[in-house]
């Protein structure tokens, strides 16, 4: 028994459980029986608190300030323990996803993280930055703080964060409780700091950072920045107390503001001239002026951001490397904005805005387009529009425009259609109407050439196949040309259009060759010729489409329409064969008209020359539509686009099926007789066919 105290002391030193198992008072599952300080009892495990017998509660380490995870980390409590994880945009210094504070791990910024795609990360960064600058009350000091933090080493997260900070702080960038002279001085200082700060986000050095954003994110945040700049500069300008004309600039942005009262309205002409770019506003003329009103006008000049707002992702390309591969609209000028505020609002109503902007790239081939950035202040989604703007003058280096509204203006270089919105809508309606009428007429032609046995011949066989090919081409065009939401389906539609239109051209070529053989009097084997006609009419287009698809299948279907892309001149896989057939048919057309005119004049010498010419002209007009030579207007439109060529091409080819029906069926004596036999027993039709 004398050894028992020594054994207890030895067991305590080793922190071992004594042989007794606390049988009288059993321990809870999260506790164990131990001897501490010579006392045997139930003790809660680490991470739990209680007496070990009746209660052992989980400790909330995340609520314990001594156990907090530190800055830029979130704490998660678990049963008996906890762990820390860095917030999005940061990583642990130990490169482990989970850690605890006592192992020395901290969260550091992850510069390679795609935080700009994570709203949680953006919100966390904004809140963190706002916490740092919330105590800054003076606008100039606030802008200086943003400038210092954004002057170098920007990430996409930083750009988005500071744009949001500027947007949220723009309402603070004004002065209300200062003296008149102090207000004007402070407004000047604020505008200067504001321009210097915004320059950090729009200078060319930041383009590589903007490139890391998706197209939608880039446009949205850039729109928000421009909107914030417009609103903030106008708000600061309204703080002036006396007539003011103030300008300031940085490397890639310039600002000019005007503030004046109604007494000076006749003498102040708001304008801006920067690097040869000029903008001027013209108010509506009034007989009398309100003596109590004032006007603030703000011009903002963005030197370099145009490529960021182009429709292409390849905005990092230098202007001379632009490849107008599809129907794109690239900004080839600076972007200049004008905003205005008058009190009362009717004091200074706008009549028009004129501006002249220089081209960053010489545009000798593609047309210039006056445009403005049309966006929603609610969603900050925007796109270029030309509504309300018209081009007044343009050459290779400059373009002048006139608009009837305020916003951000620029000059676009467009490889798309050289027609206005109004003409485009009219041409669209003409195309739809013409194709519907042509489909009906072509269906009647197919029925006529297929089922009237009395008129069957080589010529009607060619007519029938031409009508079938053209019918299918126009049907696919009408149904599928604009179904570009699914890339695969759009590519299939483009491939079908490519084949059927080439097949139609092939049969137009066969029409020309067959007419030439008849007129010249060549004797041929009908069976052999029929076989080769079918091979040429249907197999040769398949070969062209097959080779084209094998070499450039990704060029079938564009982002706008389901047709061939102009990228890498892929469109010439259609234009090339079409032009060759048009050339062959034009030569055949010339020979046919010449032979027919001489033959008619020789048979009927008593008929006047005028009558012969008129007779040949009718036949020539029919041949123009039958041989597809009206497609020459399409070639002219590609070479030298204009509204005239657009209308000529649209009308002549959308209604091609109708003209074929008129010339081949309605005006044909033999087919008229067949129609008469078919409908003579129908009471409603007998009178009109008699």
Swiss-Prot record:
One cellular component (GO) term of this entry: plasma membrane
Organ and tissue specificity: Detected in the majority of epithelial cells in tumor and normal tissues. Expressed also in human umbilical vein endothelial cells.
Extracellular-side segments: 20-432, 482-499, 554-573, 640-646
PROSITE patterns given in the database record: ASX_HYDROXYL, EF_HAND_1, EGF_2, EGF_3, EGF_CA, G_PROTEIN_RECEP_F2_2, G_PROTEIN_RECEP_F2_4, GAIN_B
UniProt keyword Membrane, yes or no: yes
Record region (GPS): 370-419
Swiss-Prot/TrEMBL induction comment: Up-regulated in tumor endothelial cells. Up-regulated by DLL4.
Domain spans labelled GAIN-B: 244-419
A UniProt-annotated Pfam family: GAIN
Coiled coil regions in record: none
Localization in the cell: Cell membrane
Function: Endothelial orphan receptor that acts as a key regulator of angiogenesis.
Family: Belongs to the G-protein coupled receptor 2 family. Adhesion G-protein coupled receptor (ADGR) subfamily.
Subunit structure comment from the entry: Heterodimer of 2 chains generated by proteolytic processing; the large extracellular N-terminal fragment and the membrane-bound C-terminal fragment predominantly remain associated and non-covalently linked.
Name of the protein: Adhesion G protein-coupled receptor L4
């Amino acid at each position: 028994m004398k050894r028992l105290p020594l054994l207890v002391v030895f067991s305590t030193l080793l922190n071992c459980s004594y042989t007794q198992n606390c049988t009288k008072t059993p321990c809870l599952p999260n506790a164990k029986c131990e001897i501490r300080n010579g006392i045997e009892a139930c003790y809660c495990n680490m991470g739990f608190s209680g007496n070990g017998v009746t209660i052992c509660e989980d400790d909330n380490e995340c609520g314990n300030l001594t156990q907090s995870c530190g800055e830029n980390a979130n704490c998660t409590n678990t049963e008996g323990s906890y762990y820390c994880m860095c917030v999005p945009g940061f990583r642990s210094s130990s490169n482990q996803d989970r850690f605890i504070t006592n192992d020395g791990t901290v969260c550091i910024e992850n510069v390679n993280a795609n935080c700009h795609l994570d709203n949680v990360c953006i919100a966390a960064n904004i809140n963190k930055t706002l916490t740092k600058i919330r105590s800054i009350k003076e606008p100039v000091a606030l802008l200086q703080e943003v400038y210092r933090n954004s002057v170098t080493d920007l990430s996409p997260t930083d750009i988005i964060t500071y744009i949001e900070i500027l947007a949220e702080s723009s309402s603070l960038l004004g002065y209300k409780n200062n003296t008149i002279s102090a207000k004007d001085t402070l407004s000047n200082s604020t505008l200067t700091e504001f321009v210097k700060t915004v320059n950090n986000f729009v200078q060319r050095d930041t383009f590589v950072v903007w490139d890391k954003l998706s197209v939608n994110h880039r446009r949205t945040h850039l729109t928000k920045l421009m909107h914030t700049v417009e609103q903030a500069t106008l708000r600061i300008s309204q703080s002036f107390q006396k007539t003011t004309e103030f300008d300031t600039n940085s490397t890639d942005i310039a600002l000019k503001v005007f503030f004046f009262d109604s007494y000076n309205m006749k003498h102040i002409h708001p304008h801006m001239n920067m690097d040869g770019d000029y903008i001027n506003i013209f108010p509506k003329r009034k007989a009398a002026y309100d003596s109590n009103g004032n006007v603030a006008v703000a011009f903002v000049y963005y030197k370099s951001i145009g490529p960021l707002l182009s429709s292409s992702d390849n905005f990092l390309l230098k202007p001379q490397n632009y490849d107008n591969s599809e129907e794109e609209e690239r900004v080839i000028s600076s972007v200049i904005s004008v905003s205005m505020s008058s009190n009362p609002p009717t004091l200074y109503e706008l009549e028009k805005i004129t501006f002249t902007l220089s081209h960053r790239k010489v545009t000798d081939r593609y047309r210039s387009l006056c445009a403005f950035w049309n966006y929603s202040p609610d969603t900050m989604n925007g796109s270029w529009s030309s509504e309300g703007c018209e081009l007044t003058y343009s050459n290779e280096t400059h373009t002048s425009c006139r608009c009837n509204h305020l916003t951000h203006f620029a000059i676009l270089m467009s490889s798309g259609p050289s027609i206005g919105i109004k003409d485009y809508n009219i041409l669209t309606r003409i195309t739809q109407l013409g194709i519907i009428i042509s489909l009906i007429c072509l269906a009647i032609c197919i029925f006529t050439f297929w089922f009237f046995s009395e008129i069957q011949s080589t010529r009607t066989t060619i007519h029938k196949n031409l009508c079938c090919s053209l019918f299918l081409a126009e049907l696919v065009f009408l149904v599928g040309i604009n179904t570009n939401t699914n890339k695969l389906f759009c590519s299939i539609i483009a491939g079908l259009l490519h084949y059927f239109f080439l097949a139609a051209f092939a049969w137009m070529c066969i029409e020309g060759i067959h007419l030439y053989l008849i007129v010249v009097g060549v004797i041929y084997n009908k069976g052999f010729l029929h076989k080769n006609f079918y091979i040429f009419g249907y197999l040769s287009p398949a070969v062209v489409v097959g080779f084209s698809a094998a070499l450039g299948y990704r060029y079938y279907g564009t982002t706008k329409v389901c047709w061939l892309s102009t990228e890498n001149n892929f469109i010439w896989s259609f234009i090339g064969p079409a032009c060759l057939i048009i050339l062959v048919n034009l030569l055949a057309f010339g020979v046919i008209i010449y032979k027919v005119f001489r033959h008619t004049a020789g048979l009927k010498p008593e008929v006047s020359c005028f009558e012969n010419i008129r007779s040949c002209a009718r036949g020539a007009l029919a041949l123009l539509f039958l041989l597809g030579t009206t497609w020459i207007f399409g070639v002219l439109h590609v070479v030298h686009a204009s509204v005239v060529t657009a209308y000529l091409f649209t009308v002549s080819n959308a209604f091609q099926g109708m003209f074929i029906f008129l010339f081949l069926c309605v005006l044909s004596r033999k087919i008229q007789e067949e129609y008469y036999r078919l409908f003579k027993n129908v009471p409603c039709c007998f009178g009109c066919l008699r």
